[in-house]
């Protein structure tokens, strides 16, 4: 039984599915997708549960969410292993994901009060009050790269605000989704407040097409995000929050410490085997001897990276990609760029056929025309050389995406220029592109999102504002508007 609907675990009536470890092919999870009728049922019970949940005092909702945080802490080792085995990422990195999930609780509570909550301003004749109300029934679509943390970033603030939810994990990480929902069950969520439907494209389409949804919160690829945007077009009454990918530039302008710059680049481009939406995809390196030395050192150190199993000892820096098919897609993208005229500096290599273990690749594309403006979700770094900083900014902005952008430089003035001219939601200076703070908004412009950033701003798309002018009693104003006459007329 792999679906959780109205507080009950039930068997899906859709397609049979199984999930294997992307390196060992060990079967980890088996179950059936939710069919359209079960998806509709999940929405119906969420609708029925909404009025009571929304009317709970905030403290009551907060108590359940904090109980969930305590359960995450108590089961950290178990959830770490589930995430690591299912995604292929090393144990150390999966542990950091669970830690981020735990920290998200306190941050979301603070954000609720700071961004939404209730605020009152006293007036001479009463008060002006700002309140926030939940939307209703929301669908949450989760990604596979952070199958616990990223859905958590939607689910927690949405529940705190008083919404009820239908959660569809990625079909590539059903085990993590199920494990997390079991912790929510133990936290004491009332039946119907949060529902789990497993499945792939058909389940997702059935969910996103429901008329009774009040909104959809999505993290994933731009192609799927655009499809959802088209599907919900003409429905302005529904909230749609899209957190999509990027073709992110990292500018290497002035290298005071070569190894530090190489380390920053490795963290930006290859952590999580390149499967973070903020990963550097385009490396812009200034022409000259300093840039040459930096690139040579980068190729040297990156060439030593050996992906490994989730439980290897010692632990590898990177594990496998989410699937062997994902690794093959990266290889095809590299060959395509070679065919366009790219010069390979470090060839990616499959460690073992049939697995998702893939070494990083680096290819120079300076002067190459018609390079696809796409997010290759894996450890492939494209290099361009530039002559001056204005050219670097032009290259950085030469994309339909706008998620993250970074600069390595000792010159603060250059960073100030980048802040003014960069088209990206995250702009870092001498910090990895993959570094982001939950106390700040997380999101991008262009094809990277629809101006609904998550993290600290997630509270904004989980509730709508209600403004009120209030007075405990009704009185006639001392001064009337022109043309109004309330004088008593004598009877004739």
Swiss-Prot record:
Q: Which InterPro entries match?
A: Ald_DH/histidinol_DH, Ald_DH_C, Ald_DH_CS_CYS, Ald_DH_CS_GLU, Ald_DH_N, Aldehyde_DH_dom, SuccinylGlu_semiald_DH_AstD
Q: Which reaction does it catalyse?
A: N-succinyl-L-glutamate 5-semialdehyde + NAD(+) + H2O = N-succinyl-L-glutamate + NADH + 2 H(+)
Please give a single GO biological process term from the UniProt record.
Answer: arginine catabolic process to succinate
**Pathway where it operates:** Amino-acid degradation; L-arginine degradation via AST pathway; L-glutamate and succinate from L-arginine: step 4/5
The GO molecular function terms of this record are: succinylglutamate-semialdehyde dehydrogenase activity
**Binding residues for NAD(+), per the UniProt record?**
220-225
Q: What is the name of this protein?
A: N-succinylglutamate 5-semialdehyde dehydrogenase
Q: What organism is listed for this UniProt entry?
A: Salmonella gallinarum (strain 287/91 / NCTC 13346)
The gene designation is astD
């Amino acid at each position: 039984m792999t679906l959780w609907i109205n507080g009950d675990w039930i068997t899906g009536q859709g397609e049979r599915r199984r999930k294997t470890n992307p390196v060992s092919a060990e079967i980890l999870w088996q179950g059936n997708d939710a069919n359209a009728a079960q998806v509709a049922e999940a929405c119906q019970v969420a609708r029925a549960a909404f009025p009571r949940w929304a009317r709970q005092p905030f403290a009551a909702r907060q108590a359940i969410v904090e109980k969930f945080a305590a359960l995450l802490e108590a089961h950290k080792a178990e959830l770490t292993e589930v995430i690591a085995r299912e995604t292929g990422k090393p144990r150390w990195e999966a542990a950091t994901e669970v830690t981020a999930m735990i920290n998200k609780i306190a941050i979301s509570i603070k954000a609720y009060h700071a961004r939404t909550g209730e605020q009152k301003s006293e007036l001479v004749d009463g008060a002006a009050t700002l309140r926030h109300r939940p939307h209703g029934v929301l669908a949450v679509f989760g990604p596979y790269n952070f199958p616990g943390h990223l859905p958590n970033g939607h689910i927690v603030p949405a529940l705190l605000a008083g919404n009820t939810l239908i959660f569809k994990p990625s079909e590539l990480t059903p085990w993590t989704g199920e494990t997390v929902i079991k912790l929510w069950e133990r936290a004491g969520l009332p039946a119907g407040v949060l529902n789990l439907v497993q499945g792939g494209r058909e389940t997702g389409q059935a969910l996103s097409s429901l008329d009774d949804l009040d909104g959809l919160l999505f993290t994933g690829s731009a192609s799927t995000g655009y499809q959802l945007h088209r599907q919900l077009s003409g429905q302005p009454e529904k909230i749609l929050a899209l957190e999509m990918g990027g073709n992110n530039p990292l500018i290497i302008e002035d290298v005071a410490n070569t190894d530090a710059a190489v380390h920053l680049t490795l963290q930006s481009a290859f952590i999580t085997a390149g499967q973070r939406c903020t990963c550097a995809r385009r490396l812009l390196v200034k022409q000259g001897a300093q840039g040459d030395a930096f690139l040579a050192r980068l190729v040297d150190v990156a060439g030593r990276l050996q992906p490994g199993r989730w439980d290897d000892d010692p632990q590898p820096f990177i594990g496998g990609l989410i699937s062997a098919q994902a690794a093959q897609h990266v290889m095809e993208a590299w060959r395509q760029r070679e065919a366009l005229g790219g010069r390979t500096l470090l060839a990616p290599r499959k460690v073992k056929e049939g697995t998702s273990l893939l070494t990083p690749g680096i290819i120079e594309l300076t002067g190459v025309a018609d390079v696809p403006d796409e997010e290759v979700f894996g450890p492939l770094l494209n290099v361009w050389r530039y002559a001056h900083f204005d050219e670097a900014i032009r290259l950085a902005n030469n994309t339909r995406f706008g998620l993250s952008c970074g600069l390595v430089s000792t010159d603060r003035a250059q960073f100030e220029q980048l802040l003014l001219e960069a088209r990206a939601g995250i702009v870092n200076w001498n910090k990895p592109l993959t570094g982001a703070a939950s106390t700040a908004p997380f999101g991008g412009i262009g094809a990277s999102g629809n101006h609904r950033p998550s993290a600290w701003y997630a509270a904004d798309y989980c509730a709508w504002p209600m403004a009120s002018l209030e007075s405990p009693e009704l009185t006639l104003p001392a001064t009337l508007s022109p043309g109004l006459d309330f004088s008593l007329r004598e009877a004739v």
